[in-house]
A protein has these predicted regions:
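Periplasmic-binding protein-like
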Residues: 142-149, 216-255, 277-291
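Short helix-initiation/N-cap motifs at beta->coil->alpha
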Residues: 98-110, 155, 172-173, 188-198, ...
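Bilobed "Venus flytrap"/periplasmic-binding protein-like clamshell domains
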Residues: 65, 76-91, 125, 143-197, ...
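Acidic, polar ligand-binding/catalytic clefts
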Residues: 98-162
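Bacterial lipoprotein signal-peptidase II cleavage site
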Residues: 20-32
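A ligand-binding cleft/hinge motif common to bilobed small-molecule-binding domains
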Residues: 107, 123-132, 182, 201-202, ...
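Extracytoplasmic small-molecule ligand-binding "clamshell" domains
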Residues: 33-119
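Ligand-binding clefts/hinges and TM-proximal coupling segments of bilobed small-molecule sensing domains
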Residues: 41, 175-188, 227-231, 255-291
């Protein structure tokens, strides 16, 4: 993780109070990706196996507004979900044949390693430690860790330097939790970020800290909170997959790059997170060599 004080990311700019249902209602998400017909892949590749199976299992968050949140129809919606649909469509797999599995910060690597999921697209920060056990395509978005406080910011928390000795809620096993320790915060671990809201309301903690896009979704959905808007890390979101499958990773990177150029990535954003956040520049994918 690269700590960078003062980093500003355009995607954090909120555009007013919008109903979260407007951006998570499945009827108002991005247009469905066009499923490739008669697509063929080299025999023995993971792409060929998935295409032949006609289905794919993708792990994503079920409780994160804007990126991955289960809707009234019990299906996840959000930007991560749309990225998953784009990849599936290029494999010749329709959205109806995606098996969505809930992943949280503590089980993403185990789910990939065990084969329980084919991919993880779940606000999943790429870092060197994780690269030791799983591989990453992307990044497809870059966030930054920020801070959520009560509306009006009664404790005048302006940045991470103000968190020393302060009770802060974050998710157990996340990069956000580790970053907070570097600033001397007293971390109250939670299973999910929605579980942090009541401790903040009640005064058990003074702040919640994680990626700005996650906090923006929470603030948009729940009254009485605001984002400090002072991101202090770089969080490149990647698509997790099996460690040694370089061919699949390279293919996904090509799909992402194509989506930047043909407008599919932008449509996925505007139909989900773009209901609340400004359109960012897509990051260049990183075709890194495995250690």
């Amino acid at each position: 993780m690269r700590l960078k004080k003062g980093l500003m990311i355009s995607a954090i700019a909120l555009t007013g109070v919008l109903a979260l249902s407007a951006c998570t209602n499945s009827a108002e998400t991005a247009p469905e990706a066009t499923v490739e017909e008669d697509v063929t892949f080299e025999a023995g590749t993971r792409m060929a196996e998935l295409n032949e199976a006609g289905e794919i299992t993708i792990g994503t968050k079920f409780d994160q507004p804007l990126f991955g949140l289960v809707g009234p129809d019990n299906k996840p919606v959000g930007f991560d979900v749309e990225i998953g649909k784009l990849i599936a469509a290029k494999l010749g797999i329709s959205a109806d044949n995606i098996n969505w599995t809930e992943t949280v910060s503590t089980n993403r690597e185990p789910f990939i390693q065990s084969g329980e999921v084919d991919l993880v697209i779940a606000t999943y920060t790429i870092n060197d430690k994780r690269k030791e056990v799983v591989s990453f395509a992307g990044p497809y978005y870059e966030a930054g860790q920020d801070i959520l406080v009560l509306e009006g910011n009664p404790e005048n928390i302006e940045g991470p330097e103000d968190l020393e000795g302060v009770n802060v809620c974050s998710v157990s096993g996340s990069t956000s939790e580790a970053n907070l320790a570097e600033y001397g915060a007293v971390v109250l671990p939670a299973a999910g970020y929605s579980d942090c809201l009541e401790p903040l309301r009640s005064g058990q903690v003074s702040a919640i800290s994680t990626d700005n896009v996650i906090l923006a979704g929470l603030a948009d959905q729940n009254e009485g909170f605001e984002v400090v808007n002072n991101p202090f890390t770089e969080e490149p979101y990647g698509i997790g997959l099996a460690l040694e499958d370089d061919e699949f990773r390279s293919w996904i990177n090509d799909v992402l790059t194509e989506s930047y150029e043909d407008g599919d990535w932008e449509a996925a954003w505007e139909g989900t997170a773009g209901k609340v956040l400004d359109l960012p520049e897509p990051p260049a994918v990183d075709n890194y060599a495995r250690p």
